[in-house]
Amino acid sequence: NRIRNELLLAAYLFEYPSAAWWESVPACAAAVSEVERPQSRAVFEEFFDYIQESSQGEFEDAYVRAFDFSQNTNLYLTTHNRTDFGKQSEELLRYKQLFLDNGFDLHNELPDYLPALLELASAVSESQALHILTEVQPKLELLRDRLIEAKLPYAFLLDVVLTEAAGLSGRTA
């Protein structure tokens, strides 16, 4: 899978910055050198610079404000633009099926959690990764637009994911 590193880095950066997460920052920052596309590599480098320039408390507070206290920008993709809980349930089942179809099951997370979906796409073949990313693309675009509107740097990470997915399919993002 040509975009495995990019997907894993994006998944990592969207995860809650726990103590284990902070311990992994140096290794993940070093992995940025393996990103092939220069524009994507630059986004990751700048994001890791942002992390290094923030105190741990500041970064964690910003993360919580961005994703835990906002319905507009939370990381559970089926909650965006959803007032029909029946349709939301159907989407959750479709996302769950993406995991099951690829031999994975989630035990501690909902299947619409962005980092989990990115990790799944990184662990499968390119054609399966493209299928997964195409399935969630409208939700990724909506979340990216909301992150841009909220002036959050995480929008650039979704730009990378969407650009890399487009590269797999031969499109331009």
Range-by-range predicted roles:
Residues N1-D112, E119-A173:
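Charged, alpha-helix-forming regions
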